[in-house]
């Protein structure tokens, strides 16, 4: 299991939202490329990037910042937010993004996931965001009647590289991830699961490591590494040695 720092982009800056609300944002850095370099220096093996404006608009919005990040670092990246079609996926992969995350598009159009996996094997990740176990889309603005587990099962056999599971109620709230829900999802599918939402201490990372065998491949952390609640270098060292 690896620790994956997040860069959430809004109007070209690194921000963090509380529970996905655009009006509840905190700007942590004006230069995303500098921030990416800092996470790389601290031992990050993968960088998670979200185009927040893109997620709400349904089309890419922070391309210049994304390009600057990719050029600034040598470690691989995964990107989500507003990616709804094959040409957009192709454009981002051509830019140097390692893996593309499909969220709203995956829920609304599973055939897109299947086609993307066929065209770009190993480079498509599905993001499943849930509130009380139900899938939320459109930048979390809309909760559907589909459960996270049912949606995840739909992608078995497609060749999806990973599923990022975010518990919206925990995101940006520094309350710890939803271990039970994350484990239940991981055990229900064969696709590796990356936990997201609420990872806010080394203890949270240790707790996720206890369920690593169920299929947990990583933990995304955002606010905690910006505020210093998690020292990224320490978190990376913890996962490398397999626990405390």
Curated annotation (Swiss-Prot):
One function term, GO molecular function aspect: 1-(5-phosphoribosyl)-5-[(5-phosphoribosylamino)methylideneamino]imidazole-4-carboxamide isomerase activity
Annotated active site: 8, 129
Single GO biological process annotation from the record: L-histidine biosynthetic process
Involved pathway(s): Amino-acid biosynthesis; L-histidine biosynthesis; L-histidine from 5-phospho-alpha-D-ribose 1-diphosphate: step 4/9
Chief location of this protein within or outside the cell: cytoplasm
Catalyzed chemical reaction(s): 1-(5-phospho-beta-D-ribosyl)-5-[(5-phospho-beta-D-ribosylamino)methylideneamino]imidazole-4-carboxamide = 5-[(5-phospho-1-deoxy-D-ribulos-1-ylimino)methylamino]-1-(5-phospho-beta-D-ribosyl)imidazole-4-carboxamide
InterPro entries linked to this entry: Aldolase_TIM, His_biosynth, HisA_bact_arch, Isoase_HisA-like, Isoase_HisA-like_bact, RibuloseP-bd_barrel
EC number annotated for this UniProt entry: 5.3.1.16
Family membership: Belongs to the HisA/HisF family.
PANTHER family to which the protein is assigned, alphabetical: 1-(5-PHOSPHORIBOSYL)-5-[(5-PHOSPHORIBOSYLAMINO)METHYLIDENEAMINO] IMIDAZOLE-4-CARBOXAMIDE ISOMERASE
Annotated protein name in UniProt: 1-(5-phosphoribosyl)-5-[(5-phosphoribosylamino)methylideneamino] imidazole-4-carboxamide isomerase
Species in which this protein is naturally found: Geobacter metallireducens (strain ATCC 53774 / DSM 7210 / GS-15)
Lineage: Bacteria, Pseudomonadati, Thermodesulfobacteriota, Desulfuromonadia, Geobacterales
């Amino acid at each position: 299991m690896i620790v994956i720092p997040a860069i959430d982009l809004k109007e070209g800056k690194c921000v963090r939202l509380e529970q996905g609300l655009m009006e509840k944002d905190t700007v942590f850095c004006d230069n995303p490329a500098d921030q990416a370099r800092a996470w790389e220096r601290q031992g990050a093996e993968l960088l998670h990037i979200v185009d927040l404006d893109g997620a709400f608009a349904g089309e890419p919005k922070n391309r210049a910042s994304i390009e600057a990040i990719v050029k600034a670092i040598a470690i691989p990246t995964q990107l989500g937010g507003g990616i709804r079609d094959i040409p957009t996926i192709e454009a981002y992969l051509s830019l140097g993004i390692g893996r593309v995350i499909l969220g709203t598009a995956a829920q609304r159009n599973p055939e897109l996931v299947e086609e993307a996996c066929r065209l770009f094997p190993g480079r498509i990740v599905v993001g499943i965001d849930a509130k009380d176990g139900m899938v939320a889309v459109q930048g979390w603005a809309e909760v559907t009647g589909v459960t996270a587990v049912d949606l995840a099962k739909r992608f078995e056999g497609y060749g999806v590289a990973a599923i990022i599971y975010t518990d919206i109620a925990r995101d940006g709230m520094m309350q710890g991830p939803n271990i039970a829900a994350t484990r239940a999802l991981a055990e229900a599918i064969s696709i590796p699961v990356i936990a997201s939402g609420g990872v806010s201490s080394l203890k949270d990372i240790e707790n996720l490591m206890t369920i690593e065998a169920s299929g947990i491949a990583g933990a995304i952390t955002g606010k905690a590494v910006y505020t210093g609640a998690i020292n990224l270098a320490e978190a990376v060292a913890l996962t490398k040695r397999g626990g405390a």
